[in-house]
Curated annotation (Swiss-Prot):
GO molecular function, one term: 5'-3' exonuclease activity
Domain UvrD-like helicase ATP-binding intervals: 1-343
Function: The heterodimer acts as both an ATP-dependent DNA helicase and an ATP-dependent, dual-direction single-stranded exonuclease. Recognizes the chi site generating a DNA molecule suitable for the initiation of homologous recombination. The AddB subunit has 5' -> 3' nuclease activity but not helicase activity.
Protein name per the record: ATP-dependent helicase/deoxyribonuclease subunit B
Gene (name only): addB
Keyword presence, Transport: no
Cofactor(s) recorded in Swiss-Prot or TrEMBL: Mg(2+); [4Fe-4S] cluster
EC numbers, comma separated: 3.1.-.-
Single Gene Ontology BP annotation: double-strand break repair via homologous recombination
């Protein structure tokens, strides 16, 4: 056995020399002894192509390209040992999950870590690392003993505990595998054991190419190959000059030199004959002087500058998308103008999770065939999600999110239904489940579900309509479609006594759902749409899931396992599934990660994402062991994978290999902002290249072509799909500013689209948006009548909504749009409860001919409990009875009603006003309803304003009878005359108008009532700040102040004293008014004269008539109001409908000026002519 090294810098022809030797040997002796060509896994396909790609060698049996793992498979097939089942990454994770669950109580560190994302990936990686470095469970145990004996600090104790846990888990893992299964590292260990018995390898010519380091396990394989083979050639990327002096860890080729010495040591131990090392000094790869200079002087300090013509380009981009589009345009140019093939080009990157989706999308748009050398997770495939969410439903008590994740995979749908119809029905079904809070036992109970449209607390709920019955039947039918297969799965899993029976339950679940047929439908549909990558996904995922179940059964089939552990193990396995990469076609751009890629025969390389922290990478202390812990183990003589510090030192070699891949052109780029617009920095690596090549001018890549030259803009004309967006951009520019100079070629591009039979329809649809104006066209009279009827009947809040935004009114009352109902307690529900509770108490007092003042504190508490218990079953589908949390909330609401009752009691004691009616309807029909406020509009349409008044109070004195309105609010509110002027606050004055106009309801025939005011009563249970020694009476007084009613009252001192008989001078604690010593009102008093109330009444009528006329004439302008920090859009549900956008010319807020009450009153007078 002899050993020969072939060394040389990148591009010196090491691989070419080896391949030519093999090809010459095959040409001369095609049937000689075996030639093994060992390369890293990523290089096998392209090396095989290179080996048999010459004119002389079209095929070969004698020479084979292997990775170490593929060689293991080949040898085990020959000499035996491959009968043990292979366990893949998913199987490893499942087995480790099972071991963790059984070992939990005995672990020190990893007891709770199993629930962290990525834990099993790290744990599996740690065990694989142990194996690669020939560390057995007994070695790990010895490590623990040594560490435990010398642990004095908390950090040392933590490491000892961690090693103890790892030893237990590793030992259990190995015991589970022994004699039955092989993981990837076991194959290599078996290869070491079986190589001496292989006739295939005996006396083989062995080439090892493309490596710059070997793990101890790989070195052991090399040792065995030295014993079996006839001759071994190993290529290493290293400069011969490096051996002339001692190397240190900062040298570019430090790692390679270490590898060279390790292999030589193995050769010495095996007494292998050392042949003369072949040192290659030429650079045949580089056809570009600049790239040759970059390779030759990459590590030079200071940087050797190159002033000649360069084939290196450096770009910064506005964002990631602009960067990738710039790459795509240049690739198309190289292919079109410089005779490149797509296979001549590679795109290299590091942070693939940020780039892969963008690359797939944009390269498809630019018609660039490409291959991404990266495995994709199966986690998001419908089949994997269906199984995972079904198991989560069972383990998580049928939670809403798990149920509808499962539903949205569409694998629960019956096979023969129309998907479009079923999707719509399932959307309705989801809305029902959200509205009724369906989860848990509601899914599995035998009782059918009920459906009732929402009714107020005053409406009866006994009679079911035909519409409700139909919806009920539909909801129960859909319920069975969803729950039946999952309940069957649940029952089978609970009955199962072994893992095999549990896996069988999952298999039957999928078979009974006709999943194979449904996946076949998806595959056919993907093929028909030309998406062949995703078409193969559907075949792969079924096969992988079946393999997963088989592996589970093979490993643990006869074991008993709790349902929760089974679900955890199964979920862990599902999360580890990955799609296999389809080998690239003969002409595709290769997209690869710089850490794992091994490229050859590349003419142009695009390095993208060269940002600070990425190239070179910022070390991340991930994995089971930290750098400090690895250093401790290294000091104890334990060799493991490099620390992040060592990895960082190797970064320069990784980057060196990256920039020396191409023979002709190198492009380096980075975005200056991420997807969220945050600033990114160019890397120090880019700056280094710029220093080496001063003549290279950094260019900026943008998606906005307006500031570019004509030549640069022409480069943006690529595929029709992509160019259409740039035509849009340019026509927007032309629309605003016109074209200047020689940019009128865009009209030629435009003409292509509008005259092309293939693109005319799509371009018309896209380009029509150029003249889009987000305006709502006025409705015709006919459409307005259809939507609103021949007679307008609406509440005051509807009229206020129109003045806030006419389009929001149209969406809610014309189109009848509404948010979907969610099973939760919102502010309107709480407000409704408060109103109903106070009404019930007040009705009881009226029936008993008592007032609030007659109630004791104990009665207030008793009544608050009584009414809440009565209302709770009727509110929002019994939401207050649905959970312990809502039961607690019910108690808090009862306390608010209790507090409010106490305050109303105090108000009643201090007031000459008494409630005479509650929840007074007007325009609602029925004997108890007051008539509506009626209008005949100028266009002849009749309009009625209707509503319900919370409370009407009456007081009498020698000057007459007075009526006032009290409105209960669950938030603080005051009457702002500016809002009255703009028609945004009409409710209270309307109510006052209605009761004054219908005063006979509460008075003797012929008597006239005067307006006393309108007041808001804030229902709440306030907190107050008091001194530590405050008495209970003082605290109650402070609380009472928090209930001061705001609004507008009659500017009559006697009437104000009727509202607060304790008021002589100063501010009232009950209403927002105060008196000076001379009997006049204080400046802060919110008062109006009787004449002003009359003016306000006229103005409200005038405003309603204006609103009614606009509604009937079809005004639906997208014109939300804005006043100060208030805006109609703030809480609007219809923004996604109207698409209001301030950047559009037609979309601007209707800005309203805030005014003092006196100024607003003056404007109101002007409007009504007084």
């Amino acid at each position: 056995m002899s050993l020969r090294f072939v060394i040389g810098r990148a591009g010196s022809g090491k691989s070419t020399l080896c391949l030519r030797e093999v090809q010459e040997e095959l040409k001369e002796r095609p049937r000689g002894k075996t030639i093994l060509y060992l390369v890293p896994e990523q290089m096998t396909f392209q090396t095989q192509q290179a080996l048999i790609g010459s004119e002389e060698v079209r095929a070969s049996i004698r020479a084979q390209v292997f990775s170490f793992s593929r060689l293991a498979w080949k040898v085990l097939q020959e000499v035996g040992g491959a009968s043990r089942l292979h366990i893949d990454e998913a199987g490893v994770h499942m087995l480790l999950r099972k071991i963790i669950e059984s070992r939990k109580e005995g672990l020190y560190v990893f007891q709770k870590a199993a629930e962290q994302n990525g834990f099993f990936e790290h744990l599996g990686g740690m065990i694989a690392e142990f194996k690669r470095y020939n560390i057995t469970p007994s070695h790990v145990y010895e490590m623990w003993q040594q560490l435990d004996a010398h642990s004095s600090s908390a950090e040392q104790k933590l490491l000892a505990n961690k090693i103890y846990d790892l030893q237990l888990l590793y030992d259990d893992f190995e015991r589970a595998l022994i004699g039955k299964y092989l993981d990837s590292e076991d194959y290599l260990q078996l290869l070491i054991e079986k190589l001496p018995f292989s006739e295939y390898v005996k006396d083989a010519e062995i080439y090892i190419d493309g490596f710059h380091s070997f793990s101890p396990q790989e070195l052991e394989i090399i040792r065995q190959l030295m014993r079996c083979g006839a001759r071994m050639t190993i290529t290493l990327t290293v400069d011969e000059k490096t051996f002339a002096q001692p190397v240190n860890e900062l040298d570019l080729f430090y790692e390679t030199v270490l590898t060279y010495e390790k292999v030589k040591q193995v050769a010495r131990e095996e007494k292998v004959v050392m042949e003369k090392t072949i040192s290659l000094v030429e650079q045949p790869r580089f056809h570009s002087p600049a790239l040759a200079h970059l390779e030759a002087h990459y590590e030079s300090r200071p940087n050797e500058k190159f002033y000649g013509e360069t084939s290196i380009a450096i770009h910064t981009a506005a964002n990631l998308r602009a960067e990738v589009e710039g790459v795509a345009r240049e690739i198309r140019r190289l292919v079109a103008e410089e005779n490149y093939r797509y296979r001549d080009i590679a795109v290299l990157l590091r942070n693939g999770e940020s780039y892969y989706d963008v690359l797939r999308t944009l390269f498809a748009d630019y018609d660039i065939p490409h291959f991404i050398d990266e495995k994709r997770s199966m986690s998001h495939h419908p089949l994997v999600e269906c199984i995972r969410s079904a198991l989560e439903i069972i383990s998580g008590n049928w939670r809403y999110d798990a149920v509808f994740r499962c539903v949205k995979t569409e694998l629960l749908y019956p096979l023969d239904v129309k998907k479009e119809v079923m999707r719509e029905e399932m959307d309705e079904f989801e809305n029902y489940c959200l509205a009724y809070g369906v989860q848990g036992k509601k899914w599995t109970a035998d009782e059918p579900w009920t459906y009732r449209r929402y009714r107020s607390l005053d409406e009866g709920n006994e009679v079911i309509t035909d519409r409700e019955r139909q919806m009920e039947e539909k909801m129960n039918r859909l319920r069975e479609i969803v729950r039946t297969p999952i309940i069957r799965l649940q029952k089978r899993l609970k009955r199962a006594s072994t893992v095999m029976q549990m896996c069988e339950a999952v298999y039957l679940f999928l078979e009974e759902l006709d999943v194979p047929k449904k996946l076949e439908q998806l595959r056919v549909r993907a093929e028909e749409s030309g998406d062949f990558l995703f078409a193969t996904d559907h075949d792969q995922v079924w096969e992988e899931v079946m393999n997963l179940l088989d592996t589970f059964v093979e490993m643990l089939g006869e074991e008993s396992m709790s349902l929760s552990v089974f679900i955890d193990v199964m979920t862990t396995g599902l999360e580890a599934l990955q799609f296999a990469n389809i080998p690239p076609s003969l002409d595709q751009v290769l997209i690869a990660n710089i850490d794992r890629s091994r490229l050859s025969n590349i003419r142009a390389t695009f390095v993208i994402g060269a940002n600070e922290g990425v190239m070179p990478a910022t070390p991340t202390d991930e994995g089971m062991l930290s750098d400090e812990e690895r250093d401790v183990l290294a000091a104890a003589g334990v060799e493991l994978a490099p620390t992040t510090r060592q990895t960082l030192l190797e970064e320069q070699f990784v980057l060196y290999q990256m920039v020396t891949r191409a023979s002709e052109k190198l492009y380096i780029s980075c975005p200056l902002a991420d997807e969220e617009g945050k600033t990114l920095l160019a890397s120090s690596f880019m700056k280094k290249i710029k220093r080496m090549f001063p003549n290279v001018k950094e260019t900026f890549v943008t998606n906005d072509v307006n500031d570019l030259s004509r030549a640069a803009q022409i480069s943006y004309v690529t595929t029709p799909e992509v160019t259409l967006s740039y035509v849009m951009q340019q026509l927007q520019t032309w629309k605003r500013y016109g074209f200047e100079g020689d940019l009128d070629f865009w009209w030629d591009v435009y003409n292509f689209y509008v005259t092309s039979d293939e693109w005319k329809q799509k371009s018309n649809r896209v380009l029509s948006s150029l003249f889009y104006r987000n305006r709502a066209k006025k409705l015709s009279t006919a459409v307005s009548r259809i939507l609103y009827g021949d007679k307008i009947k609406g509440s005051v809040s509807r009229m206020e909504l129109f003045n806030r935004c006419a389009y929001a009114h149209f969406a809610q009352h014309g189109l009848s749009l509404r948010e979907r109902d969610i099973f939760k307690l919102d502010a309107p529900d709480i407000g409704e409860l408060f109103h109903a509770a106070l009404k019930k108490i007040a009705d009881k007092l009226l029936r008993e001919k008592r007032t609030w003042a007659d109630l004791s504190i104990k009665e207030c508490e008793h009544l608050s409990i009584l009414v809440i218990e009565e209302i709770a079953p009727l509110l929002q589908r019994q939401i207050l009875l649905s959970s312990n949390r809502h039961a607690y909330l019910k108690q808090k609401l009862q306390q608010i009603i209790f507090r409010t009752s106490l305050v109303l009691r105090e108000h009643a004691k201090a007031s000459g006003f008494v409630p005479v009616d509650l929840e007074v309807p007007f325009g609602m029909g029925g004997k108890d309803s007051l008539p509506p406020m009626e209008f005949t509009l100028s266009n002849g349409v009749k309009m009625e304003v209707v509503g319900r008044i919370d409370r009407v109070d009456k007081a009498e004195d020698e000057s007459g009878t007075f009526l006032r309105i009290i409105d209960y609010k669950s938030s603080s509110k005051a009457l702002d005359l500016t809002e009255v002027y703009y028609g945004l606050a009409l409710q209270m004055l309307t109510y006052l108008d209605v009761v004054i106009s219908n005063a006979g309801t509460w008075m003797k025939q012929g008597e006239v009532a005067s307006p006393a005011g309108v007041l808001y009563f804030h229902i709440h249970n306030p907190l107050v700040e008091v001194k530590g020694d405050a008495s209970e009476e003082e605290i109650e007084k402070e609380i009472l102040k928090k209930f001061k009613m705001k609004g507008l009252v009659l500017g009559d001192a006697d009437v104000v004293r009727l509202m607060d008989n304790k008021l002589s001078t100063g501010s009232s604690d009950i209403i927002s008014a105060g008196l000076k010593k001379d009997g006049s009102f204080s400046a802060r008093s919110n008062i109006a004269s009787e004449q002003e109330f009359s003016v306000l009444q006229k103005y409200v009528h005038h405003t309603f008539e204006t609103i009614g006329k606009d509604i009937t004439e079809g005004v639906i302008d997208i014109a939300p109001y804005k006043m100060g920090n208030k805006a109609a859009c703030t809480f609007c549900h219809f923004r996604s409908v109207c698409q209001f956008d301030e950047s559009l010319e037609d979309n601007q807020f209707r800005t309203l000026k805030d005014m003092k009450d006196s100024e607003a009153m003056e404007k109101i007078r002007e409007e009504v002519g007084e």
